UniProtKB/Swiss-Prot annotation:
Co-factor requirement: Mg(2+)
Catalytic activity of the protein: UDP-N-acetyl-alpha-D-muramoyl-L-alanyl-gamma-D-glutamyl-meso-2,6-diaminopimeloyl-D-alanyl-D-alanine + di-trans,octa-cis-undecaprenyl phosphate = di-trans,octa-cis-undecaprenyl diphospho-N-acetyl-alpha-D-muramoyl-L-alanyl-D-glutamyl-meso-2,6-diaminopimeloyl-D-alanyl-D-alanine + UMP
Descriptive protein name: Phospho-N-acetylmuramoyl-pentapeptide-transferase
BP GO annotations: cell division; cell wall organization; peptidoglycan biosynthetic process; regulation of cell shape
Membrane-topology descriptor: Multi-pass membrane protein
Family: Belongs to the glycosyltransferase 4 family. MraY subfamily.
CDD domains on file: GT_MraY
Domain of life (superkingdom): Bacteria
HAMAP family on file: MraY (MF_00038)
Catalytic activity, EC: 2.7.8.13
Subcellular localization(s) per the UniProt record: Cell inner membrane
Residues that span the membrane, as ranges: 26-46, 75-95, 98-118, 135-155, 161-181, 183-203, 222-242, 259-279, 283-303, 311-331, 357-377
UniProt cross-references to InterPro entries, sorted A to Z: Glycosyl_transferase_4 (IPR000715), PNAcMuramoyl-5peptid_Trfase (IPR003524), PNAcMuramoyl-5peptid_Trfase_CS (IPR018480)
Length: 380
């Protein structure tokens, strides 16, 4: 918004020329989101406490250390989303369809998570929105955003249906990390949309499963946001006519550098939230935060053409999800459990690990995986 309002005035005030540079707006968005989160955090937490909007999502078989957390203010993800939305709308180029796609999916998944949290709080139970309904809504959000923001429609009066689908603004090819595109670069065609839906929903639900300890989900989330900031800038930026994507032999995506503003906003809002979510947490993000942030990260994987590389980057989230799948499969087929409790972070709790130790070690692993994902840019 500021880019569109103030940059045209640069001929009168040369200082405003900085708005033309994505790098400046990326930093500004991150700082804005961080300041907003830090300033509004205490107000939000106190309001949630007064309204008694506390966590009810405590399982009967949960470790004893979690039972004392019942009643901790929840739905802190709403604060994250507000900070992200404000910072993105202020500093991003709002003519960029990629920015709108990422932001709308994030907010759409936030609305789903908000509904889930509200049902849990109002009914005083941990069930919330039915799983099938949640899945249908998640699919619907991605499909609607894809056709609204990422496809080209042309108006032709001579056709029976005047609006004609022309093509997609998203490259329908996929690549593998560490594998040259000349060896693996298939065009998925009409199968790409279902694949895109799967990536976004899987990432969203994986972050949701990881959000079980204080700061456990938000830590890897901010690491992923910074990684995608770098990946999006490499994919779209040109410096004095020099393309970073061409040099590194990764897909060139014009306009992708603007996604750095969105990623920086997530980073800033996430760090601010971590200030209040670190052990022992003063507030939980709730499904409104975990589903939304996961959806946003999933969209970043799609828009920067790192769908498979995101499996490395999101290794912590993936491990948590796989642990649940294996636990359910083993119990249903053999009657035995592989882990003491799933997701796997609870397994380590029951083994006697202190909660802060689990959290910090998972953060360290997420940083290591992010570095491996970044290596995949060059090693192809």
């Amino acid at each position: 918004m500021l880019y569109h309002l103030l940059y045209p005035l640069a001929y009168k005030l040369s200082l405003l020329n900085v708005l033309r540079y994505p790098s400046f707006r990326i930093v500004a968005a991150g700082l804005t989101a961080m300041v907003l989160g830090l300033l509004l955090g205490p107000i939000f937490i106190e309001r949630m406490r007064v309204l008694q909007y506390g966590s009810t999502n405590v399982r009967e078989d949960t470790p004893d250390t979690h039972k004392k957390k019942a009643g901790t203010p929840s739905m802190g993800g709403a604060l994250i989303l507000a900070s992200v939305a404000i910072a993105t709308l202020l500093f991003a180029d709002l003519a960029n369809r990629f920015v709108w796609a990422a932001l709308l999916v994030t907010l759409g998944y936030g609305a789903i998570g908000f509904t889930d949290d509200w049902l849990k709080i109002s009914k005083k139970n941990s069930k919330g929105l039915a799983g099938k309904k949640k899945l249908v809504l998640q699919v619907l959000v991605v499909v609607v955003v894809y056709y609204a923001c990422l496809t080209d429609w042309r108006f032709h009066v001579e056709h029976r249906f005047p609006w004609v689908f022309v093509g997609s603004y998203v490259d329908l090819h996929v690549t593998l990390p560490f594998v040259p595109s000349r060896l693996f670069n298939p065009d998925l065609g009409f199968l790409y949309l279902p694949f895109m839906v799967f990536v976004v929903i899987a990432t969203s639900n994986a972050v949701n499963l990881t959000d079980g300890l204080d700061g456990l989900a938000i830590g890897p989330t901010v690491v992923s946001a910074m990684t995608f900031l770098a990946l999006s800038y490499v994919a779209g930026a040109t410096i004095a006519g020099f393309s970073l994507a061409e040099y590194l032999r990764v897909p060139y995506i014009p306009g992708a550098e603007e996604l750095g503003v969105f990623c920086s906003a997530i980073f800033g809002a996430g760090v601010a939230f971590l200030w209040y979510n670190t052990y022992p947490a003063s507030v939980f993000m709730g499904d409104v935060g975990s589903l939304a942030l996961g959806g946003g990260l999933g969209m970043m994987a799609v828009l920067t053409k790192n769908e498979f590389a995101s499996a490395i980057l999101h290794g912590v989230f993936l491990t948590e999800t796989v642990s649940v799948i294996l636990q359910v499969w083993s119990f249903k087929t053999t009657g035995k459990r592989i882990f003491r409790m799933a997701p796997i972070h609870h397994h380590y709790e029951l083994k006697g690990w202190a909660e802060p130790k689990i959290i910090v070690r998972f953060w360290i692993i997420s940083v290591m995986l992010a570095l491996v994902a970044l290596l995949s840019i060059k090693l192809r």
